[in-house]
Amino acid sequence: MADLEEQLSDEEKVRIAAKFIIHAPPGEFNEVFNDVRLLLNNDNLLREGAAHAFAQYNLDQFTPVKIEGYEDQVLITEHGDLGNGKFLDPKNRICFKFDHLRKEATDPRPYEAENAIESWRTSVETALRAYVKEHYPNGVCTVYGKKIDGQQTIIACIESHQFQAKNFWNGRWRSEWKFTITPSTTQVVGILKIQVHYYEDGNVQLVSHKDIQDSLTVSNEVQTAREFIKIVEAAENEYQTAISENYQTMSDTTFKALRRQLPVTRTKIDWNKILSYKIGKEMQNA
């Protein structure tokens, strides 16, 4: 092992450490970071070389953050990334600095985003917050209004998690929805993601995603927002139901087939008579 360490350059060590961090299960960033820190044994190298991994993890995971002085949490996503460690809170029209390692927001300041699309963004946000409150007790959502390739675009992000370290499991739901404001009809594109880690007496992860496409009728802001939420609700309910049904089927069939109900001899062992069996005698003589 010592020889291998000597063969690895600092760049290679950081690259390996960054991969561990980026792939940390939800709710387990600190544990993975601390383990990597011990393995690397060079705090300066880790902080400087793997800083991009800290940022990528938070962007990928839709990490929610509370800003002091404001009621609602906001999600850290690529759509709100203003560069230089600053992020947008479109609801409160502010930008703030975000520490990707400590996961803390500081220095909130007024920020004016795309005013031309703000009425559409607000309508979608109002409808989405009501939906999230009903379906995700711990959910957080952030809605952006941006001009992309010259088109006014709405991007809606949802995050909900449950971290149960005492019960050896953590899980996170993420979904991202996007559509452009065009006359009559537009295309809604979404991606739904589930990631769960269970690690009591084993190490099992569920990592699943589904891409969605649907048509949306565009009328006024409020009605369009309602129709959009109907698409979101139908798709997310269908996906969650399918996941549950698949796992029930696997439990009833696949996993049962993996278990041998009787040993190869087709006879159950009488543990009270174990010494009379050949294996018992071998154990006794060992």
Swiss-Prot record:
Pfam families: F-actin_cap_A. Gene3D superfamilies: F-actin capping protein, alpha subunit, F-actin capping protein, beta subunit. One of its GO terms (cellular component) is brush border. GO terms for molecular function: actin filament binding. InterPro entries: CapZ_alpha, CapZ_alpha/beta, CapZ_alpha/beta_2, CapZ_alpha_1, F-actin_cap_asu_CS. The keyword Acetylation applies. Component of the F-actin capping complex, composed of a heterodimer of an alpha and a beta subunit. Component of the WASH complex, composed of F-actin-capping protein subunit alpha (CAPZA1, CAPZA2 or CAPZA3), F-actin-capping protein subunit beta (CAPZB), WASHC1, WASHC2, WASHC3, WASHC4 and WASHC5. Interacts with RCSD1/CAPZIP. F-actin-capping proteins bind in a Ca(2+)-independent manner to the fast growing ends of actin filaments (barbed end) thereby blocking the exchange of subunits at these ends. Unlike other capping proteins (such as gelsolin and severin), these proteins do not sever actin filaments. This is F-actin-capping protein subunit alpha-2. It comes from Microcebus murinus (Gray mouse lemur).
